Every structure is written in structure tokens, then in C-alpha cells.
Amino acid sequence: MSILIPNKDQAETLDKCLKSIEKLTDYENYEIIIIENNSTEEKTFEYYEQICNDKIRVVYWEKDFNYSAINNFGAKQAKGDYLLLLNNDMEVISRDWLTELLSTCQRKEVGAVGARLYYPDDTVQHAGIIIGIGGVAGSVFVGMKRGYTGYMHRAAIQQDLSAVTAACMMMKRSVFEEVGGLEEELKVAFNDVDLCLRIREKGHLIVYDPYVELYHYESKTRGAEDTKEKVRRFQGEIEYMRSHWIDILKNGDPAYNPNLSLKKWDYSLKVN
């Protein structure tokens, strides 16, 4: 099992992530690969020296930020038969998280597994992704209080979906390689959705597992879409998805009822 964590500076954030893994992981046969991406703070490299051991190693990506390319690079360095993509701004909060992910991912028909993620204020950040929400794809139950189960208890039930976020996503290595990894044209947005859709095209299931829970301090490293260049890049990624996945965007997500709204995240009824 190989855990891939891209990182740029933010040593404190990464440290919180790694300590939570160490504290709350009951499955021991794993390695952690930190994919270093152009950090500038000296304390970051000092931190790397402190943490490297038999389980943790650092590899260096020296090109511009491209989430897809960075993780594809990390996957090539990995030794495990299973790959876990994990953001550096995550904090594990369920003890059997890795065992749970692995037990689901080992099912023959499963290609990838995602988790239930919360913001630090204990509201939902991710409980699965529906194609079409927000125009291309969006997370459901965003902002719902932790403990609430949502429409038909969907937030609390393990289920097959069309996509889950790569902020915490486990895959069989063989499946990742079968589909050619992440699409590097999608540098930041929708690369996880595109990956999941390609995995589904090959006949594998995408599973949302609510029993795996983590906090997500979202976009601490990447930042917001707050410049003209970032806005242009984001628009290009939207156009990529609309051109490559026109059928599912036109016909609707097979994991979502067509009578429900794509304008809201809470499974509200569509109102014409």
C-alpha cells in the first residue's frame, strides 16, 4: 500500500496529516511518499530530514504545479499494489480508516474508493460527487452537519457513485495503470472526476465509503482561483470535461435521480 501526498511548504499542515496517520492507522503494511513540489521554505526541507524513515520517503517533482502529473510521477515511485491519493491538508479521524479503504478496494469489482470528508467545523466537505451539479460535477451534502445522514441516509451509506474526490481516494494500482493514470491536461480541477469516469468505462465500480472519515483543510497549499490565469485555466478544464464527457453530462449521472435538482447539493427535488 502506497500513500501519495503532494506537498509544497506548509510543514505544519503536513505534520498534522502525518501524525494523524501514525496515530490512527491500525494497518501497518504501508509506505508514505511525499511528492515535493518546489518548496521555498528552509524549514520544509529540515522537516523532510526529520521524518524520513523506513515508511516515509520524499521524491522531488521540479516542474510547475500540475496535480495530475505530480501524482502520476509519485505513482511510478510507489511499491504498493494499492495507491492512496491523499492531500497534505488532511487529518485522519477514524482509527480503522486504512483497513476500511483497503477492504473495500480489494473487492474484485471495485476500482476506486473515496471517503467522507469534513471541514474543521464538522460540516461535510465531501460525501460523493454527482456529475452535472454546478455545471460539470460537484460534491453533495456540502455544509451539512456531521452526524446528519441526509436524503434517504445517502451520506451515511456505502454506495456506488460515478465519482469521488482524490483528496482521499484509494485505487488498485493495476486499475490506475489500466486507465493511464490521471489526465495531465487537467492540472487542478476535475482530474479526479475524469479519472473515476474512465475507471467506470473499464467496468470497475467507484465506491463512496462513509465509514472512512477525515478532516479536510481545503486548498491550503493550492489557494483559490483568484487570478486571471487561474480563471482561464479553470475555464479550460470545464471545456475539457464538457467535450470529453458530453454523453453523461447530457443524459445525466446514472447514480442520481433525474427528478432531483442539479442546482443544489442536498438531493432537493427539481423545480421547473
Predicted regions and their residues:
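Active-site acidic Asp-centered loop
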Residues: N37, L86-D89, E183
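C-terminal, non-catalytic tails of nucleotide-sugar-dependent glycosyltransferases
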Residues: M1, G111, D121, I133-D160, ...
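Acidic donor-binding segment of Leloir-type glycosyltransferases
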Residues: E22-K63
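A short, conserved alpha-helix in the catalytic core of glycosyltransferases
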Residues: W97-L101, A155-G180, E185-Y215
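Glycine-rich, basic loop-to-helix element that forms the pyrophosphate-binding segment
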Residues: W61-A78, D96
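A conserved hydrophobic helix/loop-capping motif in glycosyltransferases and polysaccharide synthases
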Residues: S2-T13, C17, K23-T25, I34-N37, ...
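Conserved donor NDP-sugar-binding/catalytic core segment of glycosyltransferases
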Residues: M90-V136
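Short aromatic/hydrophobic "clamp" motif used to bind/position activated sugar donors
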Residues: L83
